[in-house]
Amino acid sequence: MPLILAGPILRRTESRAVTVWLALKAPRQVELKVYSTAGGTGEIVDRPLLQGTSSTVQLGKYLHVVAVTAAPIDSNILTSGQIYVYDINFAGSRESHSVIGGQENERENLISSLWPATSELSSLGSATISYFNHQLPTFALPPQDLNYLRLVHGSCRKPHGGGRDALSILDNSIAQFAGMANSRPHQLFLTGDQIYGDDVADPMLWALTDAGDTLLGWEENLPLMDEAQIRKNLCTSIPENPAKRNIIREARENSTESQIPKQAAAEYKYKKPVQLKPGTRSDIARDFGGFTAMLVNKPKNAKSHLFSLGEYYAMYLLVWSPVLWCDRFPKGKDICENAKQAKTWDREAAEMASFSGNLWRVRRAIANIPTYTICDDHDVSDDWYLNREWCYRVLGKPLGRRVVQNALLAYAVFQAWGNTPAQFERGKVGDKLLESAANWSKSAGTDDLAWENVAKYLGIPRIDIETGLPKFKLDEDVLILDRDEEVLNWHFTIRSFKHEVIVLDTRTWRGYPTESAIDPPMLLTHKGFEEQIQKPLQETESLNQTGEFEIEATLVVVPTNLVGLWIIDAVQKLDVEQGKVFNSDAGDAWNFHELAFVKL
């Protein structure tokens, strides 16, 4: 197995800073250098302009992650109209010897660390991440003339979604114009779910559980409370409106009973991921986690829901890189209990094979274009934080809270770090999160203080010790999650010479109505509008006035629907009136809350 498990992925890229993300199987000191090219064409590597060094963070026995940022050498900055090259070198860590069998401080470079021996390359595709003979990745900054700006937009990406993985098409687009700075794609915005935590193919979960436990070097204890404990927890009155009817209690009383045998539920308070088999997790996700993806008679939507931290980590590695994929999945008849399940398994395995076959193209593409992502719902689970009832029913259960925290930690490491590397600088909240995550893993999931700190930095709301339910607090006329002040932000702004992109977070900045727990929320609170939209625009105006930028165009990425189709709106309004808010993500669009819609 090569040193690099996933990456390099070119992330936040500006004239004075370039960030590259990697996942390695062993600890390393990682050095990133950005070079000019002769004539700006990308063909011949010239002199280094930016340089940076960073150490990997150990998140598992065989999982070491880094987002290394290169800063200017002397007064060099990057400009438009030029193609730049970057290279990475790895220095052995004091914590372990070189993977390739050399001495402790033997250096490895990017090319030697990407791929295994040639004889093992059959399932990995082309052994290159470059479009040039020098075999190194390249990029170009957005142009000064907006007429030449090339932005690429992608949305959700589900491995077993059917059809070809469209992200692989980007590889052809870059290859066609690789040597033309103003014609090749300049930025990639992936504004949908980069993984699906809920809707997972059975063969994929089979691979993820094994890979996740191996990467961590330990098996997580997933908290499954027995039915009596859950009922007691959920039937506690909601503190904000004690006079109101208890929607959570009513929902619990009206729901179907768990399919899990009572004896087994009472006997096991904790289970390992491997004990929760592919295709069997829908009832567990609903009854022990409170999740809603499988409601409206769609158990298949959560039959292989991710639960463990290792599974969420491994999912990112498998959708971004071909390295950890097996050559072939076992046949359904050898895994499943009946013919129907076996047929589903074999169909999904074929879709997985099709998906993985083009991953080398995806890997090369995202190594050669600055890539930005958002925090969407399926990165955690369907309907994540949709309304107050969702928060109560999921965060009020140990398994639900654990899964949300696992998913958000994985998102922070694999996505947010590259979007906003400044948040992860030494002493910042992201750095504290990584330290806590490393401590949690080193303890094999037993360091409660580390896990509490992870929750704090991720903005997981506090729990009421009397009710076991998440706390809310009043913010002007709406309720917001009672989170710590020192939390990671998922929203960000990226500016170039003539344009900027403002990416909103409409999941964790919601304002929930005080009346009913199922009423549609404001997708951004009043403070959210100020922090995520007004402040960036004010900063841009100031930067334009000082001459540092000349922003002529502003793009805003709004994760949820701005305006829905009238027929969808009609169905969702009926669902809200009937209390069936999880039937159709009712209320997860801007036009459902008039004040927020007008303000936007």
What are these regions (language model features)?
Residues 1-600:
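Extended recognition/assembly regions associated with phosphoester-bond processing machinery
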